[in-house]
Amino acid sequence: MAAVMIVFDFDKTILDCDSDNWVVDGFGFTRLFDKLTSTMPWNSAMDIVMANMHSQGITIDDIANCLKKAPLIPHIASTIKIAHSLGCELKIVSDANVFFIETILKHHGLFDCFSEINTNPSVIDEQGRLRIFPCHDLKSSSCISNLDSCPPNMCKGRIIERIKTNAEERNKRIIYLGDGRVITAQC
């Protein structure tokens, strides 16, 4: 029997909410965020909101503490730990960002269960501000999946295809767990 690889979405699959909205709402920046997302890509809006939060004295530690209060899907932590202990290879493909995902996974003792996290990059700059960038180039990104709704910053289908090819080469079966439609017809 082939080994198993489980690919998780993060928001609304591991986390019982959207991590971006959790932080934006938690610090009272919902109105600004909604205004920005009506005129620009989601990641660009998040980066601007992070700049506004930083300029108002909200620190990276404040953001981390907010994220640590975000609720997980019931029983997901034990499910992840059991799957990992049984030898399943676990990965994440998410339109969230590195800082948010890693902060939450580490807080719940789940970070080491995952062999790969595919998401939007984020860095803490020299001023201590969280910067969020798109996973794929907004100008040259083209979606290969069967989803017309892939955001311009991340084609999950492209990432899943790479993971799938790697899994097939290593004789692994893939299980995808997410809150939306299946990313590719072949998954």
Regions found by a protein language model. Name each.
Residues P74-K81, S85-E89, A96-C187:
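C-terminal cap/substrate-recognition subdomain and adjoining C-terminal extension
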